[in-house]
């Protein structure tokens, strides 16, 4: 479920085209272990895809917190 929310949020915000800004949102939200490869894994919905990795809830929360900071 988190992957689906994350993927849709990236699309709505345009951050699917700006991974650096997405990484900044994670860092501002306090999640410092996000990476470009994790972003790719977390936006993958097909669980049979070798890239798929379930997005932890704390990562999604930090991402939203970072987006709020960026929006200020």
Predicted stretch roles:
Residues 3-4, 18, 24, 31-56:
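A cross-kingdom feature marking solvent-exposed beta-strand/loop segments within repeated
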């Amino acid at each position: 479920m988190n992957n689906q929310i994350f993927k849709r949020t990236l699309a709505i915000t345009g951050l699917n085209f700006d991974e650096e800004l997405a990484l900044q949102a994670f860092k501002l939200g306090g999640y410092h272990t996000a990476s470009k490869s994790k972003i790719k894994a977390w936006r993958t919905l097909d669980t049979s895809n070798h890239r798929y990795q379930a997005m932890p809830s704390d990562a999604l929360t930090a991402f939203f917190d970072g987006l709020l900071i960026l929006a200020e």
